[in-house]
């Protein structure tokens, strides 16, 4: 069994520029291993993700050798015509004439209201009727109750893209299990994003790794995370943002679904990880464009987590923090406008965490 899809978001870079040679190599390795499903979005990497699809995938491989999914940034449109303009831009960037799967991006309560206002679900249906999208759906970041409401009103969609990983499975904020079960109730197949939680489950405390080694010592921490998501029966695709050939090879290996006993062991690792993680940030970056003070929120939270795991390393961590503040607002620059919190898929209390960052890392 292998349900792995290639998420074109966390692509390899050299000096902040995409490394197209490396992307070609990873793309080719994924296809050679039997992979077919590629996922991108209008807003990923400021449009460079879709451009990379066109350059590294569509221009180099036959169209029938892969499936391509992209997403409408419906939160940025102001009319139905805007939906068409954005969609046509995406086709051009990706170098294709249709998408196998086309989704509304990042539905929460606010963005769902916009989708209703601008008839974005009708737009998805029109694309399907014209053969420009074979399947439709949406990516989702809100409660199971709202998801139930959306799927009841719009049963014509085929997929829901959910954040699912073993750390968030029972989370009250993310509601991964409840949202998954809502999709099952409505007969919708699930595509998984963030199976490794933005990479944070690739590097876990030694105590958690020792627990996971009891399940399979040959698997890396990231491998265990991907296996968990692939083991869910109603999951059709598990997206992984791979940036090395080694990651492709491990993730594309044949996977045996987890047993109930293995799931129980994994929950023991969850307790260890949660106890060692101060801020549960995935570094998705959705907060950044809303911050009026240009605060490097994900970078600061990563440093703060490192500090909290070993405060004695502050002599190594604070210089890195200070160097970031030369180009970005410091944690102390926060004015508590909470625009970041309103756009955080993880529902983090970002303002409070920034106060903790300030107290730990500033003026050392």
Where is each model-derived feature located?
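Short acidic/polar active-site loop segments enriched in Thr and Asp
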Residues: 2, 36, 97-100, 134, ...
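Hydrophobic residues in well-ordered beta-strands that form the structural core
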Residues: 39-40, 70, 192
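Active-site mouth loops of central-metabolism enzymes
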Residues: 9-21, 71-81, 110-113, 209-217
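Distinct, well-ordered alpha-helical segments
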Residues: 48-59, 80-91, 95, 112-122, ...
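N-terminal binding-site loop/beta-alpha segment at the start of enzyme catalytic domains
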Residues: 1-66, 123, 129
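Beta/alpha (TIM)-barrel catalytic core signal, keyed to glycine-rich beta->alpha loops juxtaposed to Asp/Glu
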Residues: 22, 107-282, 286, 290-295, ...
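A short, structured active-site edge motif that brings together acidic residues
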Residues: 64-76, 102-105
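Ferredoxin-type iron-sulfur electron-transfer modules in oxidoreductases and energy-metabolism complexes
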Residues: 259-278, 294-332, 337-341, 347-364
């Amino acid at each position: 069994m292998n349900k792995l899809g290639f998420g074109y978001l966390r692509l390899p870079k050299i000096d902040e520029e995409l490394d197209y040679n490396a992307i070609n190599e990873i793309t080719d390795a994924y296809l050679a291993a039997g992979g077919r499903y590629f996922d991108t979005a209008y807003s990923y990497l400021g449009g460079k993700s879709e451009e990379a699809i066109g350059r590294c995938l569509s221009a180099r491989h036959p169209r029938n050798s892969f499936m391509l999914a992209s997403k409408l940034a419906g939160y940025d449109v102001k009319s139905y015509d805007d939906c068409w303009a954005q969609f046509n831009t995406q086709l051009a960037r990706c170098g294709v004439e249709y998408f196998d799967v086309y989704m509304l991006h990042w539905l929460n309560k606010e963005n769902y209201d916009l989708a209703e206002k601008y008839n974005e679900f009708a737009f998805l249906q029109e694309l399907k009727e014209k053969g420009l999208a074979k399947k439709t759906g949406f990516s989702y970041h809100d409660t199971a109750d709202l998801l139930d409401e959306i799927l009841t009103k719009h049963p014509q969609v085929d997929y829901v893209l959910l954040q699912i990983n073993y750390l968030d499975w029972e989370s009250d904020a993310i509601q991964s299990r409840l949202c998954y079960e809502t999709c099952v109730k409505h007969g919708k197949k699930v595509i998984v994003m963030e199976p490794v939680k933005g990479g944070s489950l690739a590097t876990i405390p030694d105590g958690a790794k020792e627990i996971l080694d009891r399940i399979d010592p040959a698997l890396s921490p990231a491998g265990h995370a991907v296996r968990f998501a692939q083991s869910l029966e109603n999951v059709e695709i598990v997206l992984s943002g791979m940036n090395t050939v080694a990651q492709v090879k491990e993730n594309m290996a044949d996977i045996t679904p987890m047993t109930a006993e293995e799931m129980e062991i994994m929950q023991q690792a969850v307790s260890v990880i949660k106890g060692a993680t101060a801020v549960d940030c995935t570094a998705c970056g959705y907060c950044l464009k809303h911050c009026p003070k240009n605060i490097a929120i994900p970078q600061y939270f990563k440093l703060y987590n490192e500090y909290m795991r070993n405060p004695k390393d502050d002599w190594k961590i604070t210089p890195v923090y200070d160097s970031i503040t030369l180009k970005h607002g410091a944690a102390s620059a926060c004015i508590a406008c909470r625009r970041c919190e309103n756009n955080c898929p993880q529902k983090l209390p970002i303002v409070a965490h920034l106060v903790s960052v300030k107290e730990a890392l500033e003026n050392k």
